[in-house]
A protein has these predicted regions:
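Glycine-/charge-enriched secondary-structure boundary and capping motifs
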Residues: 2-137
Length: 137
């Protein structure tokens, strides 16, 4: 209960998945996307590296991930079940279901558009010249 406040564990597990098709279609109409990564099994690093060219990687902020926040199944797994943070990042999406890669010049417009269409959005980090390496700081 201390991780979920008044929400039951069952309710959290039964929360429906987000369907991204409609919001992504609206974003694609307005923004020149560089890549999309649907974060599924394999976690953030594996799924993001799949959509990046061989000469690019990424540096992401772990502070934006749900296992750092309250009311999170990921925080519960991390702390109560003692799942190591590195293992969390390799295995789970940690609350990030989709990553949109855009050029720096399109960043603010992308964030504004996501807010307009009521799609939660977080700035996770930046693309680097690190040859498919995705790291968290």
């Amino acid at each position: 209960k201390k991780f979920f406040n008044k929400t039951s564990f069952g309710s959290i597990l039964l929360k429906p998945t987000i369907i991204y098709v409609k919001p992504l279609l609206k974003i694609i109409e307005s923004i020149n996307l560089k890549a999309l990564a649907h974060i599924t099994g394999g976690g953030i690093a594996e799924n993001l590296s799949r959509v990046l060219p061989n000469n690019l990687g990424a540096v992401l902020s772990s502070k934006e991930l749900d296992f750092e926040k309250n009311n999170s199944i990921y925080k519960w797994l991390n702390y109560e079940c003692k799942v190591d943070t590195k293992e969390m990042l390799k295995t789970f999406n940690c609350g990030i279901g989709m990553i949109i890669v855009v050029s720096k010049k399109d960043l603010e417009q992308t964030i504004a558009l996501c807010k307009t269409i009521k799609q939660p959005v977080k700035y996770l980090g930046k693309i680097t010249n690190s040859k498919k390496e995705v790291v968290f700081n």
